[in-house]
C-alpha cells in the first residue's frame, strides 16, 4: 500500500516474530518485514535439549504451531501478512536515510530496506571461552537447530558414551538431562562453588543430589584447563583442575552474550 508504515524487524527466531505479529495487529495496513540470517525461523530454542533427548520427536515440531502448521516464510506471508527475508543478514543501519542494508547470504546480493520503524531483535550467542582445544571435532555449542541436529546425530550413533558439559547453568542442566536420557555418562564441570548459581546454595544442592543419584558426576569449583584431542582431531578428554576425564563429546555452555554489533555500529549503544 502506498505510504504505508514500513516496519522492519531484524531477527526471526523468538522476539522478532512476536514483535512482527504484534506490529501487524496494531498496524493492520503497515508493511511488516522480518530479516533473519539463518534459514530457519520462529523455532522453539528452549526445546532443543528435548529434541536431542527424543522427547520432541521430529525437527519440524520445533517450528510448528500448536496445530502442526510449519512456521516458515510462506506461513508468515499467507497467515500473518508478514514478509520474511531469511538467509539474509542485516549488515548496516543507515540512520541518516532510515534504511537497513542487508545481504542475501546464498548469493551475496545486497539491497537497502527503507523503514519508518526498526525493531532490533538479534538475540544472543553462546560465550566461547578461550579454552585450548575448543575447536576440536565434537566440541559443540547449542544455539541453533543445526547444532541440535549434530548433537542428536552423535547421541543416536552411540559413539559418545562419555560426555562432558562445561557449565552448570540452565542450559547445561537441561542438556545433562537430555544426554543422560540418551544413555551416555555425563560429567558436569562448573567453575563456581555450585551449579545453578541463580539459586541459593541449599536449593542447588538438592538438584546436585538428584543428579548424582542418576549417575551424573558434578565437579564444582573446578576449572577446565584444556581439551585434548586424538590423532584424528576429535576430542578424547577434558583436563581440569580436578583431573583429566575421558570424553568423546564436549558441550560448552558457560552463558550467552547479546548480539549488539549491529546496534553498536549504528551508534545506538
Task: List the predicted regions and their residue ranges.
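Short, glycine/charged-enriched secondary-structure capping and boundary segments
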Residues: 22-25, 47-51, 99-101, 132-136, ...
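FAD-binding core/adjacent interface of flavoenzyme oxidoreductases
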Residues: 2-10, 70-162, 237-244, 251-254, ...
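Short clusters of hydrophobic/aromatic residues that line enzyme substrate/ligand-binding pockets
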Residues: 48, 52, 129-131, 139, ...
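Beta1-alpha1 glycine-rich phosphate/pyrophosphate-binding loop at the start
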Residues: 2-85, 178-199
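A Rossmann-like FAD-binding core segment of flavoenzymes
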Residues: 29-33, 85-106, 113, 181-269
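Glycine-rich Rossmann-fold phosphate-binding loop(s) that bind the pyrophosphate
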Residues: 11-14, 143-144, 167-169
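Rossmann-like NAD(P)H-binding beta-loop-alpha module
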Residues: 146, 150-199, 203, 235
